[in-house]
């Protein structure tokens, strides 16, 4: 399928954004021309080479590998650049007429606006508050759309930081210093990103579709581009304005902006805990930011200001009480009549109808629907058929309303249901009083529940999604399986379903399933795979039978799908034996310290479309790795320190989940503590630190990471929630403080904002690299402890390469 219209529209919109950046002064006309002349040249070469390969194949009957991929790129790049080329030619006819003439471009430099210290402080705070708010809310939406895999999370954070760094770098080279215009662009830019999010979703994604990794990267980068570029540009220009007019050192400006981000993080932790929905908050924040800009920079009359305030209050009330999220969910789920939607700390639940059939979507994907007999029966009966008389069953996640009738086909007396998101339980519309057995519903983290709870069960059934993230990976580790076994009766049954089994599994798929299978065999004496709609691993210390149909007859269980009508025991047994023969017994076991299954799952996703694998890797290298080549030597320490802190942030959040569980509110507090450390380090002059040189401070930071690595096992062994949270909270303060102080020391002599621009862009580029490498590669491949040692290695690299003068 060729996205001719979609590609043309998207590229044209990007060209329009670049042109608006030129018209508003973010970059020069020469930069705009160079950028798009280069893009047009590159795409022309790609299109021409693709056409040449196709001509060779047709004329000489050559068998060129990947010709279909070449054809796709030939059509996509040709269609995308055709319209843009026309626009570019029209806008720059004079440029092509005078291409051989020497033209001196006007400087376009304007004086910095004069602002009082109070006004510039408020402006910096608003920039920080709005930027952090939009970041959190857009991240929720993009993670919902893209599937929320670890790499896509890193892609979002990396794209956010890289595009902000582009804006910061552009600010250092731009002569546009009009704070009024800068604030107006900043206030409008989040709305542009929201429009792009809706437009790209409608053009390239089907309802409920999880995009490929390459599509997720491009989608995320394009959505964030308008807001983040202007956000980075605005912050650096305000730093320069504060320095010239109020004599603020860059570190103080950075501190004030960070405080705005802290307040936003804490406030959103409260509002997104079920009080308001995403688009209610996002539109309100955009409205307030625009009102601030109008009232402070464009409106002077008292009556007119009063009118703007009243109008803003009315519009905010309309947004908060009208429920705009239903409209936006309808746009994101075309073809579905959305009847209601609810955001929770853990995701989004949307209720809809299609041709009169009601369905429930969780994070844009179908959660419950009618006639799901095959799925619900496999999820329950493969496990419970192994027991003659199961009396106590633990069901972890999944649809309770759908699965409970299947459980009640057995002589069960007590059913425990663990689901972290209480809104999912509410969406079931289940009358607990009408259930004939004892039903206990717990809205708790299943990892911690099995770790501390003393109940014993005859069967534990895990229906959570695959280990696509480090958070989900916890439920497929040897540690979790050991906790499950402790909660099982001597002949108890445990079953999980890590993912879908392909008829022709590739190496990445086998590596993924092997790591989980080996983790189970290290804990249970018997583990049997059953390949149904998903691959189910049935585990027990007792004998396990895969004669499923025979067991349904013996237990007198009447099913629609799991029965002789649809299944055959000999085929199930043969398939089970085939799966075991393909799995690698030498594959590394999945554990909390080595979450290798998460890495294999992401590798498997990348391998599902081979035509996108190489472009995906090239895109990641260009966007997240190559920016280090643009970092000046004097800023390499800032780059490496920011990269290490970003990686440490990921590690600390994973440690929180492994010790305390998935506790959303504490996550916000820890991030606020990290930002507070940055703010204090960058904004406060601590005299005794001034006597120490930069290299020594960085050595302290590297040593701190080494100490944390050495006590990692102790941190993971802490069972007390208050003690674990306190230790984790305190652990982020020192590295964030020192990293903020490094920014302060590097930029303290900056007079015109140019040094701050390149240092800030280095900070952002380093953070992007750290998020990507640590979360997506290092932790799964080399483990938690070695990854922390790697952070100290990054600091030492910054010391060796970045604390000497340029030659």
Give names to the regions the model predicted.
Residues 104-807:
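Alpha-helical transmembrane segments of multi-pass membrane proteins
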């Amino acid at each position: 399928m060729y996205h001719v219209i979609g590609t043309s529209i998207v590229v044209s919109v990007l060209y329009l954004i670049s042109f608006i950046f030129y018209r508003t002064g973010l970059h020069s006309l020469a930069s705009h021309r160079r950028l798009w002349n280069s893009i047009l040249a590159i795409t022309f070469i790609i299109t021409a080479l693709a056409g040449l390969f196709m001509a060779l194949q047709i004329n000489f009957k050559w068998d060129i590998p990947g010709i279909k991929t070449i054809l796709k790129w030939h059509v996509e790049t040709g269609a995308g650049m055709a319209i843009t080329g026309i626009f570019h030619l029209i806008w720059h006819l004079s440029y092509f007429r005078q291409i051989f003439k020497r033209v001196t471009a006007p400087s376009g430099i304007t004086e910095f606006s004069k602002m009082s210290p109070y006004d510039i402080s408020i402006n910096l705070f608003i920039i920080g508050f709005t930027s952090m708010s939009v970041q959190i809310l857009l991240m929720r939406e993009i993670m919902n759309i893209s599937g929320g895999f670890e790499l896509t999370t890193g892609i979002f954070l990396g794209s956010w930081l890289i595009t902000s760094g582009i804006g910061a770098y552009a600010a250092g080279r731009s002569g546009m210093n009009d704070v009024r215009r800068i604030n107006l662009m900043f206030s409008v830019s989040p709305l542009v990103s929201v429009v792009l999010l809706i437009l790209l979703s409608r053009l390239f994604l089907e309802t409920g579709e999880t995009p490929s990794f390459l599509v997720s990267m491009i989608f995320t980068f394009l959505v964030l581009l308008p807001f983040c570029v202007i956000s980075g540009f605005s912050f650096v220009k305000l730093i320069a304005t504060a320095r010239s007019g109020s004599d603020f050192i860059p570190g103080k400006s950075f501190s004030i902006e960070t405080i705005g981000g802290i307040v936003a993080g804490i406030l959103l932790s409260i509002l997104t805990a079920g009080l308001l929905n995403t688009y209610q908050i996002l539109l309100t924040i955009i409205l307030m930011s625009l009102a601030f800009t109008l009232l402070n920079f464009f409106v002077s009359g008292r009556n007119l200001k009063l009118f703007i305030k009243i109008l803003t209050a009315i519009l905010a009330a309309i947004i908060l009480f009208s429920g705009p999220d239903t409209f936006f969910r309808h746009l994101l789920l075309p073809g579905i009549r959305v009847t209601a939607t609810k955001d929770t700390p853990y995701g989004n639940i949307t209720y809809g109808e299609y041709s009169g059939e009601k369905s429930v979507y969780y994070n844009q994907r179908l959660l419950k629907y009618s006639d799901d007999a095959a799925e619900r029966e496999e999820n329950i009966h493969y496990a419970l058929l192994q027991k003659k008389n199961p009396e106590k069953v633990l069901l972890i996640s999944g649809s309770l309303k759908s699965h409970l009738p299947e459980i009640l086909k057995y002589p069960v007396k007590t059913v425990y249901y663990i689901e972290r998101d209480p809104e999912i339980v509410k969406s079931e519309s289940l009358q607990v009083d009408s259930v004939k057995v004892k039903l206990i519903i717990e809205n708790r983290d299943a990892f911690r529940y099995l770790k501390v709870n003393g109940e014993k069960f005859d069967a534990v059934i895990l229906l959570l999604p695959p280990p696509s993230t480090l958070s989900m990976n916890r439920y497929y580790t040897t540690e979790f399986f050991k906790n499950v076994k402790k909660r099982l009766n001597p002949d108890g049954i445990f079953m999980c379903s890590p993912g879908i089994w392909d008829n022709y599994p590739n190496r990445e798929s086998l590596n993924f399933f092997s790591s989980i299978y080996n983790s189970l065999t290290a804990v249970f004496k018997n583990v049997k795979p059953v390949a149904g709609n998903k691959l189910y691993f049935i585990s027990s210390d007792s004998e396990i039978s895969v004669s499923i149909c025979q067991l349904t007859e013996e237990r007198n269980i009447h099913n629609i799908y799991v029965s002789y009508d649809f299944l055959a025991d000999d085929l199930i047994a043969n398939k089970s034996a085939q799966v075991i023969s393909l799995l690698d017994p030498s594959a590394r076991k999945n554990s909390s310290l080595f979450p290798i299954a998460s890495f294999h799952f992401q590798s498997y996703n990348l391998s599902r479309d081979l035509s996108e694998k190489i472009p995906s890797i090239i895109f990641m290298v260009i966007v997240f790795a190559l920016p280090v080549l643009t970092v000046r030597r004097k800023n390499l320490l800032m780059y490496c320190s920011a990269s290490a802190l970003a990686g440490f942030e990921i590690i600390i959040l994973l440690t929180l989940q492994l010790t305390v569980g998935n506790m959303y509110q504490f996550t916000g507090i820890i991030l606020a503590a990290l930002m507070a450390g940055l703010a204090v380090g960058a904004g406060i002059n601590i005299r005794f630190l001034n006597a120490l040189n930069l290299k020594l401070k960085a050595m302290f930071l590297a040593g701190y990471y080494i100490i944390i690595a050495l006590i990692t096992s102790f941190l993971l062994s802490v069972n007390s929630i208050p003690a674990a949270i306190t230790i984790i909270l305190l652990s982020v303060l020192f590295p964030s403080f020192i990293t903020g102080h490094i920014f302060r020391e590097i930029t303290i002599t900056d007079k015109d904002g140019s040094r701050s621009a390149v240092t800030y862009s280095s900070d952002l580029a380093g953070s992007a690299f750290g998020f990507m490498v640590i979360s997506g590669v290092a932790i799964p491949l080399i483990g938690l402890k070695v990854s922390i040692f790697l952070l100290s290695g990054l600091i030492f690299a910054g010391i060796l390469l970045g604390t000497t003068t340029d030659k």
